[in-house]
């Protein structure tokens, strides 16, 4: 059977070829788009990311997610830092060590004189408790709390019954006038006993 080629057949063939060409380009562009959206594997990572930087199952950029997590971590660290040292709790804990507390500093000459006076001239039961503020990890915060509670920031600071009884000058003056022993007994309110040593020396 002979195929008759006429203008109509030619037109049909041309249109068919054009349609095939259009379909070819459409499919080609579609494949290119699919390839662009293929997820990318980042070395040293267990998560794959697409070209927008999104991880599967997430709606925001991984970089944004990391930044958010970093900010949250900083907030946690900040809050943890604020809660690391509670000066009030530390002060109360120190007060539980003995009915008589002496806040001191190792390099302070007046602190040294006071400790020598107490050691050489009196015997306490239970013994008083000495806190060397310059050896404390949070010197400033604790000293601020001491001032807040007792009204006295300087050292030495003798605390009996939760009240500051003075520093070296006040204690030495009472000792010099033979009034310190009676003062200790009054301040103790029975919480501790104290007696003067036989070889008592005035400062």
Swiss-Prot record:
Protein name in the entry: Monothiol glutaredoxin-7
* Tree of life domain: Eukaryota
Signal sequence: where?
1-32
The gene is GRX7
- PANTHER family attached to this UniProt entry: GLUTAREDOXIN 2
Q: Ranges for the Glutaredoxin domain?
A: 88-191
Q: Which family does it belong to?
A: Belongs to the glutaredoxin family. Monothiol subfamily.
Task: Give the CC-aspect GO terms.
Answer: cis-Golgi network; cytoplasm; fungal-type vacuole; Golgi apparatus; Golgi lumen; iron-sulfur cluster assembly complex; membrane; nucleus
TM ranges: none
Under Gene3D superfamilies, the record lists:
Glutaredoxin (3.40.30.10)
Q: Taxonomic classification, please?
A: Eukaryota, Fungi, Dikarya, Ascomycota, Saccharomycotina
* Organism listed in the record: Saccharomyces cerevisiae (strain ATCC 204508 / S288c)
InterPro entries given in the database record: Glutaredoxin, Glutaredoxin_euk/vir, Glutaredoxin_subgr, Thioredoxin-like_sf
User: CDD domains this protein is in?
Assistant: GRX_GRXh_1_2_like
Q: Which GO terms describe its biological process?
A: cellular response to oxidative stress; intracellular iron ion homeostasis; iron-sulfur cluster assembly
């Amino acid at each position: 059977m002979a195929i008759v080629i006429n203008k109509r057949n030619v037109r049909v063939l041309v249109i068919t070829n054009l349609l095939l060409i259009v379909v070819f380009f459409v499919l080609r562009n579609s494949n290119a788009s699919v390839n662009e959206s293929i997820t990318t594997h980042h070395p040293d990572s267990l998560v794959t990311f697409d070209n927008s930087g999104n991880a599967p199952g997430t709606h925001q950029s991984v970089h944004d997610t990391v930044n958010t997590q970093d900010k949250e971590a900083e907030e946690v660290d900040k809050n943890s830092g604020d809660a690391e040292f509670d000066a009030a709790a530390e002060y109360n804990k120190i007060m539980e060590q003995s009915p008589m507390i002496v806040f001191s500093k190792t390099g302070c000459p007046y602190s040294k004189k006071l400790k020598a006076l107490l050691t050489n001239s009196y015997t306490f039961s239970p013994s008083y408790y000495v806190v060397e503020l310059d050896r404390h990890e949070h010197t400033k915060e604790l000293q601020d709390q001491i001032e807040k509670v007792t009204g006295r920031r300087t050292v030495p600071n003798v605390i009996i019954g939760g009240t500051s009884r003075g520093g070296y000058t006040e204690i030495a003056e009472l000792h010099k006038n033979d009034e310190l022993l009676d003062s200790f007994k009054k301040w103790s309110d029975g919480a501790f006993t104290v007696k003067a040593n036989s070889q008592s020396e005035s400062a």
